[in-house]
């Protein structure tokens, strides 16, 4: 069995001959890549637990083999969000948070779209811009009422 060599810290003079730089040269390249550090690790880990639950129940990466229907994952995400909205934080089947289920399901849906095996069974859509139009109407109502307090 090979013995590990003890860690030896470099002498303070080791890098003395090198020119001091404001930043590591690799920073210039690294900051131009997709930033992953802003994604909250605890939420990603919750999603990992939800994915594990799904893997054990349906098989790992089952959607990449069988594909998905958009409506099934949309409906599931809304059910989880509605359960949470109505006060149920934890999914009784998995024991994990409903929001983590919604995020994970939407991630699977998006992955299936990117993978090319998603059946897009959405209904025919309204004209583009209808959400913006409705938001503008809501804003106009608020302006007209002189009441800018949220209605709850």
Label each PLM-derived region with a short phrase.
Residues 1-152:
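Intrinsically disordered, low-complexity regulatory regions
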């Amino acid at each position: 069995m090979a013995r590990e060599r003890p860690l030896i810290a470099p002498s303070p003079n080791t890098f003395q001959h090198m020119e001091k730089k404001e930043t590591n040269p690799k920073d210039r390249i690294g900051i131009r890549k997709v930033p992953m550090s802003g994604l909250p690790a605890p939420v990603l880990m919750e999603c990992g637990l939800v994915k594990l639950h799904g893997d054990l129940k349906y098989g790992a990466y089952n959607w990449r083999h069988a594909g998905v229907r958009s409506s099934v994952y949309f409906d599931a995400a809304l059910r989880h969000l509605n359960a949470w909205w109505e006060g149920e934080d934890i999914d009784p089947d998995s024991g994990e948070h409903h929001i983590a289920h919604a995020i994970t399901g939407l991630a699977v849906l998006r992955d299936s779209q990117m993978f090319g095996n998603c059946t897009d069974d959405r209904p025919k859509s309204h004209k583009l811009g209808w959400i913006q139009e409705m938001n503008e109407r809501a804003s106009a109502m608020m302006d007209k009422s002189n009441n800018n307090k949220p209605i709850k």
